[in-house]
Amino acid sequence: MAVPKAKTSKWRRNQRRAQNFFNKFRRSLPSLSVCSNCGERIIPHRVCPYCGHYKGKEVIETE
């Protein structure tokens, strides 16, 4: 079995744990793209909730 050669310092341990803390926030924020029809910011690969278009075609009718 693998055994550590030296004790992990508190600083190194905390630096490793900090990466997990920041990754939670990065995953929770979705990347946004621009709708080709109306120009609003939307989640990629989804129907635009503002105009109802997806890949240049109207999928749902909106007011």
From Swiss-Prot:
One of its GO terms (molecular function) is structural constituent of ribosome. SUPFAM superfamilies: Zn-binding ribosomal proteins. Disulfide bonds: none annotated. It comes from the Bacteria. One of its GO terms (cellular component) is large ribosomal subunit. Keywords: Ribonucleoprotein, Ribosomal protein. GO terms for biological process: translation. Belongs to the bacterial ribosomal protein bL32 family. PANTHER family: 50S RIBOSOMAL PROTEIN L32, LARGE RIBOSOMAL SUBUNIT PROTEIN BL32. This is Large ribosomal subunit protein bL32. It comes from Aquifex aeolicus (strain VF5). The lineage of its organism: Bacteria, Pseudomonadati, Aquificota, Aquificia, Aquificales.
